[in-house]
Amino acid sequence: MNTADISPTLTTLFSELVNGAPKDGAYILNAGDEGLLRSLDKLSAQAASALTPTGSSIAAHADHLRYGLSLMNRWSTGENPFATADWSTSWKKTTVSDEEWRTRRAELRAETSRWLVALRTPRDVQTIELNGIIGSIAHLAYHLGAIRQIDQATRGPKEVSR
């Protein structure tokens, strides 16, 4: 199958999660929500490094997302990075300095930008590949929610009645 018919939808949903929702309506986030990247920009390295009772941190969530998107980006250029992927590595980087936090956010921003380009580009895919593409959006939404449970400074606006 070809993604031409669903590329605009995939791009809209991923972009909303990463870059924020328009004030006049949204599909996943509340209207006017700033999205993942600007939410992370609100945090200091110290806040991003705060460990949860389970041993993770927002810094680790951000690195995990960066790693997963780097795999998707490599796949989109014809590689098969999944056979040798080591997801556990991204969870080991729980604490960051100020410079490491700036770098981690910049790297995540770059991977999200590359993946948006890939989502916009129609391609022939197998069912398993389409599942991975759609799964990448759900995966990012899950981690955005987890990050927002860890630190309320990252939370978006409450839904207002219309």
Model segments located where?
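Short, contiguous alpha-helical
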Residues: 2-19, 23-33, 37-40, 45-89, ...
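Acidic/histidine-rich alpha-helical segments that form the ligand environment
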Residues: 91-141
